[in-house]
Amino acid sequence: MSLYLKAEKIQSWRVLIMACAGFIFNTTEFVPVAMLSDIAQSFDMQTADTGLMMTVYAWTVLIMSLPAMLATGNMERKSLLIKLFIIFIVGHILSVIAWNFWILLLARMCIALAHSVFWSITASLVMRISPKHKKTQALGMLAIGTALATILGLPIGRIVGQLVGWRVTFGIIAVLALSIMFLIIRLLPNLPSKNAGSIASLPLLAKRPLLLWLYVTTAIVISAHFTAYTYIEPFMIDVGHLDPNFATAVLLVFGFSGIAASLLFNRLYRFAPTKFIVVSMSLLMFSLLLLLFSTKTIIAMFSLVFIWGIGISCIGLSLQMRVLKLAPDATDVATAIYSGIFNAGIGAGALFGNLATTYLGLNEIGYTGAALGLIGFIIFITTHLKYRHTFLLQNK
């Protein structure tokens, strides 16, 4: 094997490790969605109230993403990743032993702190450690890792939670995180901070209207998705009257849609980025609009969830890629802001879902999400038409 091929193989393994890291970070962020009922029962709470775990986690990421990124901006990236994994593991140990809901929330905030920095640096790191001619594919691999969190992480987390308790699910995530940390220590090279940006980057980014409106679009569209997705488990059981085992299968289908979205992104996005985003947003809106209707048959629900998953996964990939394109001189800071705003959308969506469930009824979460999605869609189209020449100039 030539030295070039050997080096490329090592680089591919490094990308795979980061994809695995993305897998566990995404798993732990969303696995409560699959266990809300069990956690609520454990602490003698209403399911809608335990859904606020998602809000607290997401808003911790929102608040901490930029300050934590600026504080660690000059740190060597491998050592930073190791420190993040230590915080992540400690948070999960605390989740396992949590003796009341408030301690569990504290543990989730600890994990969210690690999350806030991890996702701020990961996309740019993956592109740095990947083979030169496989940058987009590397980002797609990272996306597959996060999609697998939905395919494997959420359903398995739910099954484990049902069999032996939700605490064991968090314990298993801690063990997996420890294993990945050892692989990072072993295989990743030292990675000096590069094009991370600093506090001086903020005024420059603030002068890029297309980027700012992209952040606004992100917040609204992600809120739309999580208004319904946060409460998908009780929706399927209480509104759709599905057996809990079928509810697990629906989550599995949602995860497989993420793999399909990653493949579509790799093949199609580079040819027509804006059209790709528009179609993805349309899929999300129509899926949310038809969510209640899909409960009439199991096939309809499975089909709709698959399309819904493709839409939201493609949106996440596309918007992140566009942020990197619009801020090549301050990738980590721009991505930190994106990560914070993305999680603001998660938190807001969980809150909107809670309000919709409380005041309108659980069956209305799809319509509420669709209305938000329409607002985000209109903002994206309007700003693209206004600033499309700027985007074309920046991508020549």
Curated annotation (Swiss-Prot):
Organism field: Haemophilus influenzae (strain ATCC 51907 / DSM 11121 / KW20 / Rd)
Family from the record: Belongs to the major facilitator superfamily. SotB (TC 2.A.1.2) family.
Listed name of the protein: Probable sugar efflux transporter
Domain of life according to the entry: Bacteria
Residues passing through the membrane, by range: 15-35, 51-71, 84-104, 109-129, 137-157, 168-188, 209-229, 245-265, 273-293, 297-317, 333-353, 365-385
CDD domains in alphabetical order: MFS_NepI_like
Predominant location category: membrane
HAMAP family in the cross-refs: MFS_SotB
Role played: Involved in the efflux of sugars. The physiological role may be the reduction of the intracellular concentration of toxic sugars or sugar metabolites.
